[in-house]
């Protein structure tokens, strides 16, 4: 904790000195704290979340929930045993287009799902962006690079929309920029996590999935595209594909002949719109809609991340 910054922020927002904490445990256990929002670097997720569990306080946890599957198992078990309410920030579950796509698939509108192709592209890792060695490039603090930062979202979104579990994965990861300037400007430091990750997966019901994840996609801010192909139609979910940066959905159905294949943008009914932080408040108050991710979803996701890393190292498929 930078105590000078702590004092400055406290003064700016009128926070009394007794509520300016330098130890997260004191903050979590403070009498006026009703719930805990954990948005630290990844290496602190486990210990802060465990403190919330031990205090019996609801918590909202950023992803990936831990650095390893072992930590995820411990945290998930503890939260379940103490019956502590929680939410994991797989934010794209709250996109109206994703919820609409999920519902269309559940209704059988595109028949049996065969394939899903998922892309998640950003550009801030490119050399010309001049990003220094922030914590997201340091394995001891982040666990993985683009894989955990972006790929965890992609894995969860496909699982959420299809409502199917993964059965095996195979991965490939790589790093383009191996050194970056230190934050203090004094020299450079080693990048020891991935800049990109490509992986394939099989899911229940023989669904075949491919993923392309990178921070080196020139011109992309926070771009996602998920194509879902079924026996009776197809759905395309996209985010940040236009300057408006909104989430959209296109659907193709009807005649099987290729010349009749038209992807139509669908207006999204109001019922699919939701707010992430309101959803956490609803969970705390016992009125959640059941669509937000919980600690068990985060646990499953961490096991997937670990499996993809191991698969990339071994160069082979891994069953889950």
Language-model segments: which ranges?
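NAD(P)-binding Rossmann-fold cofactor-contacting core
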Residues: 1-13
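C-terminal helix-rich "cap/oligomerization" subdomain common to oxidoreductases
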Residues: 12, 35-38, 73, 81, ...
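Beta-loop-alpha module in the N-terminal Rossmann-like domain of NAD(P)-dependent dehydrogenases
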Residues: 13-78
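Hydrophobic residues in well-ordered beta-strands that form the structural core
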Residues: 61, 86-88, 117, 211, ...
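Rossmann-fold dehydrogenase core element
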Residues: 72-91, 111-115
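Predominantly a Rossmann-like dinucleotide-binding segment in NAD(P)-dependent oxidoreductases
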Residues: 92-190, 315
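Contiguous beta-strand/loop segments that form the cofactor/metal-binding neighborhood of enzyme cores
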Residues: 156-245, 274-288
